[in-house]
Amino acid sequence: MLSLVIPVYKNEENLPRLFRELEQVAGRLADELEIVFVVDGSPDASLRILREHLATWPLRAQLVELSRNFGSFAAIAAGLRCARGEFMAVIAADLQEPPELILEFHRVLKAGDADIVFGYRTGRADPWWSRWLSESFWRLYRRFVVRDMPKGGIDIFGCTQAVRDRVLDLKEINTNLIALLFWLGFRRAFIPYERRARLEGRSAWTVGRKFRYALDSIFNFTDLPIRMLLLLGVGGTGFAVIAGLTVLIGWSTGHVPVLGYTPIMLVITFFGGLTALGLGIIGQYLWLSLQNARNRPAFIVKSAETFEPHSAGCRSASASTRNSS
């Protein structure tokens, strides 16, 4: 069985089309399909729409409700924990990634050709500024952090049950799930696709969320900011020593007049800003260390329901007050 995990946040307008496309994919899949919807504290009517539709849906499904919004990667982890299939796959509810990719994921995993299958973007129907920011970020991320990362970046993947178990063994929070999968190793396969335009609703992936995601992706997987700060500090100190000696020698020989307070203030301002930057970088690492040391769960499941095919209602429902990835 293939378990398909779909995090849901502000997707009520996309759900009717999502149901139709999933039914089409299920008809073409050479295996049983289970859909795990994870409502990540969505403030709209997504939970109600899902519960009503799944009660009479011809596909096997689970509906997991988190106690609040924990973020898409925490929601994915919650769905992976609840999934019962031999193989897993993850897509977004906005349908910008074509659900047909699930068929390719399943084919590769079923054949045993790989343990993890990534779908990577070869193009995207997004505004130019969004494309530019995304391409710039992934280019730098590939250069300095995860060198195996495809140029277009990755949002969706499929994996075996063994990989899922190893992912859930990791207790990191505020992290990048895709980078964790690369860190784990295992055999990988890559399938290209063209990212589609969003047809309904507005993306909840705001600039602020993207910025936070970028910081988590960097600080959790590289010490590059610390090393850059060290190089800046060494270079700045060396420059200050050389400049100071040059001015001192020139002043003592009468070739350089005393210039007043302006150069001193500029140097103080420069190194003061550098110090503040360094404290911010170190503080970010300390904050991430504190978050992980607290050992809080990455998510909390408020309720979980199971819907069997052609059922008049849900077969079982259960609630959990503590669940973590």
Which role fits each region the language model picked out?
Residues 64-68, 72-82, 99-180, 196-215:
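Acceptor/aglycone-binding surface of glycosyltransferases and processive sugar-polymer synthases
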